[in-house]
Amino acid sequence: MKKILLILFSLSLLSLTTISSAKSIRIGTEGAYPPWNNLNSAGELEGAEIDFGNEACSRMPVECEWVTQDWDGIIPALLQGKYDIIIAGMSITEERKEKVNFTNGYMTDGARFAVLKGSGLEGLSVDKFTGGINKVNLNNAGGKEQAAIGQLIAAMNGSTVCVQSSTIHQNFLDKHMSGAVKVKLYQSVDDHNLDLAAGRCDAILADVGSIIDFMESDGGVDVAFTGPTFSGGVFGDGVGGAVRKEDTDILEMWNKVIAEMSADGTTAEITKKWFGRDISM
């Protein structure tokens, strides 16, 4: 028994030594998804996840370095070793779990459609949906929720909906609205926001916080939400950090700090600063 305990203790020390001996952990982020992560006018990263990641790193025995990467290639670049963890508003989904391991979730935000004020799609408000449905969790969508989705599809039939490619939002349209709407794909949310404002999109679908950030900018003053807020299903189980499957030490270290920051209210305060509300997990 003593030998077993000694072996376990030695392995624990080896694990900590491996983490501590790493000079830095490289964090991959998009830098184009405000208020989650974004490059400001000075070319500096800012946003809820930048504050979150920096605070997390201050609690770890390592130095952290941020690396920006276009969204389409963000998981392939992780697997190729460009960085060690993704902190980039990435929802935890079963499809992504086939390639990477996720930390525990640290933030969560619903998804919603947005349109131009005065368009025919404005005003698909809760009174237009069976039972006054204003939130739809796809994990347990009953008859009323399914009816709400059906009415939304009917109202948006033939419309052009713009979304960022390789996202949960594209997955939702492909699964639930295929054939009913024309899906137009973009490399970044900034790109589809510009096209919505210019009238080249009938609607966009994105995280609520991202759309609010757009609405509060000069370019988004004529934008309004429409339809219910979606969560669950293809939208995943909150936002987490993604690591290579073999990097169990990094995963363990981040999970420990994520739990600490949740328990002491740090993550909640960060989300209130950037989203105006608590979306911590």
Language model: regions and residue ranges:
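Extended ligand-binding regions for polar small-molecule ligands
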Residues: D51-M60, K117-A141, T167, G236-R277
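A local structural motif
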Residues: C57-T68, A155-T160, K175-S188, R200
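Bacterial N-terminal signal peptides
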Residues: I7-S15
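Short helix-initiation/N-cap motifs at beta->coil->alpha
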Residues: I50-D51, E65-P76, Q146-I149, V183-A198, ...
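Periplasmic-binding protein-like
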Residues: G31, T108-R112, V208-N255, R277-M281
